[in-house]
């Protein structure tokens, strides 16, 4: 999957979990938590969505690598075909 | 006999709502617990359940109409005089809803809850922010397929369908925390919170207690458990807190109930309300029904669904009216402790700060341990500090031993 394609997919997963967030306002380099109060429930839902969408099981210990859109893309690009 | 279906009060801080959509028409048979109407409030769109079986005779309030709590929304033909169903104590409102005109609010049994689920599945789920954006763009939400949780329509879905161009990147950066409609909803919600909290501070003589406790064993138990189950079955620490509060309410009377007209009444079942922060401002505290009886995995799934629906604006009237005690966790905000305000007519609220490593004395030595500060605000008209201290200590004991939750 191309980097842009992956980023777009991840963004739609994030705004699916947080339907009150306008995708056009999400800044890739800033943590979700700092941008729109993404909390532990949102992170869990995101991990569940990643599992559903890509079959990737992200261990709890690696949640910090999902903190922003840029970090997600870096973390997942070699895990997602 | 003819029966009136009125807009129920949804906790102490709601006094009006706008009928958005009827799921039933005259002639339709309805069953107790069925979601018959969607009402837009400061807390988002609320699914309102009917509280008795019958046949709809007349729809009184048309969609688009804003009405106060207690207004007759519809009339239905019912069988014999309604036998007393299992009702949550009707919340006492501050506004026009107060008094005998308010419909009782139903606490659904799991079976009837499913009936409501089916009824609501047929129409679009949409967040309040997305609904506002749809209105702005002139998009018919009925024509959209939602891509959000449970098929909910998101802002993105609305924008894709709408004619207006998206905001530019520059503008977007400035307004990262502002989403469409969030301000409008937050404004109404702010007023509702202000009314309820002012009333609480005027009327309820609060006392406050706090207790720090070592939860290292619970944190390790949770990490080990979550590492050994699929991602869909992971628990959050908050689930342990919710269950610990519920079980402690069974152990000690005087914390899970309602104070009305000078009298305290213990709630027959413990319904722990969970304070959920809404992005863009405000909060709601819907209940996990009959919390003490739920095994942790069931409780966690209910909690997850509840937070998702609270943020998507899809709560049920019964969930908003039911809480007999509230848990507010500010651990995410990384504060040490919370000193919360009771939401009337409840008589207690439990607070939780962040879990984190602190210096702790173990066997005469200082060690880094995982510590959480629990707090309790309770109503001095009902309990005293000594009982409150025992209650809080019991919650701490229960959290520290999660394998027994």
Enumerate the predicted regions with their spans.
Chain A
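Thiotemplate assembly-line natural product biosynthesis machinery
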Residues: 1-23, 76-80
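Phosphopantetheine carrier-protein modules
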Residues: 17-37, 54-61, 65
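Catalytic nucleophile serine of serine hydrolases
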Residues: 40
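Short active-site alpha-helical segment characteristic of glycosyltransferases
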Residues: 46
């Amino acid at each position: 999957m191309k980097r842009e394609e992956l980023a777009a997919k991840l963004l739609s997963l994030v705004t699916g979990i947080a339907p009150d967030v306008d995708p056009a306002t999400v800044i890739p380099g800033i943590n979700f938590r700092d941008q729109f109060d993404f909390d532990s429930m949102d992170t869990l839902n995101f991990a569940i969505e990643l599992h559903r969408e890509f079959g990737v099981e992200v261990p709890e210990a690696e949640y910090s690598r999902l903190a922003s859109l840029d970090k997600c893309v870096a973390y997942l690009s070699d895990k997602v075909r | 006999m003819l029966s009136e279906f009125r807009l129920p009060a949804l906790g102490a801080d709601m006094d009006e709502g706008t009928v958005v959509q009827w799921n039933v028409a005259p002639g339709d048979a309805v069953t107790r617990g069925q979601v018959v109407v969607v009402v837009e409030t400061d807390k988002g769109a609320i699914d309102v359940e009917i509280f008795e079986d019958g046949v709809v005779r007349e729809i009184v309030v048309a969609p688009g109409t804003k009405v106060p709590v207690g207004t007759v929304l519809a009339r239905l033909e019912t069988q014999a005089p309604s036998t007393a169903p299992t009702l949550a104590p009707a919340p006492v409102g501050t506004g026009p809803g107060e008094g005998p005109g308010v419909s009782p609010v139903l606490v659904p049994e799991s079976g009837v809850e499913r009936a409501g689920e089916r009824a609501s599945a047929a129409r679009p789920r949409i967040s309040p922010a997305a609904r506002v954006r749809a209105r702005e763009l002139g998009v018919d939400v009925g024509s959209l397929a939602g891509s959000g949780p449970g098929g909910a329509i998101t802002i993105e879905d609305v924008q894709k369908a709408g004619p207006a161009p998206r905001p530019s990147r520059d503008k977007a950066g400035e307004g990262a925390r502002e989403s469409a409609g969030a301000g409008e909803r937050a404004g109404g919600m702010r007023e509702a919170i202000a009314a309820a909290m002012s009333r609480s501070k005027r009327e309820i003589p609060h006392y406050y207690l706090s207790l720090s406790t070592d939860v290292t064993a619970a944190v390790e138990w949770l990490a080990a458990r979550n590492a050994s189950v699929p991602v869909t079955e992971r628990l959050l620490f908050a689930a342990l807190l919710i269950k610990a509060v519920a079980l402690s309410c069974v152990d000690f009377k005087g914390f899970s109930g309602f104070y009305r007209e000078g009298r305290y009444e213990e709630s027959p079942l413990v319904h722990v309300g969970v304070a959920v922060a809404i992005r863009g401002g405000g909060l709601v505290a819907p209940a996990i029904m009959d919390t003490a009886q739920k095994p942790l995995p069931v409780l966690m799934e209910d909690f997850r669904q509840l937070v998702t629906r609270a943020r998507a604006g899809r709560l049920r009237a019964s969930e908003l009216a039911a809480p007999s005690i509230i848990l507010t966790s500010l651990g995410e905000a990384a504060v040490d402790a919370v000193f919360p305000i009771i939401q009337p007519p409840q008589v207690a609220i439990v607070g939780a700060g962040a879990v984190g490593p602190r210096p702790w004395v173990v066997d005469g030595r200082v060690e880094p341990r995982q510590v959480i500060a629990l707090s309790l605000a309770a109503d001095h008209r009902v309990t005293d500090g000594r009982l409150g201290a025992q209650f809080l200590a019991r919650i701490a004991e229960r959290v520290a031993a999660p394998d027994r939750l």
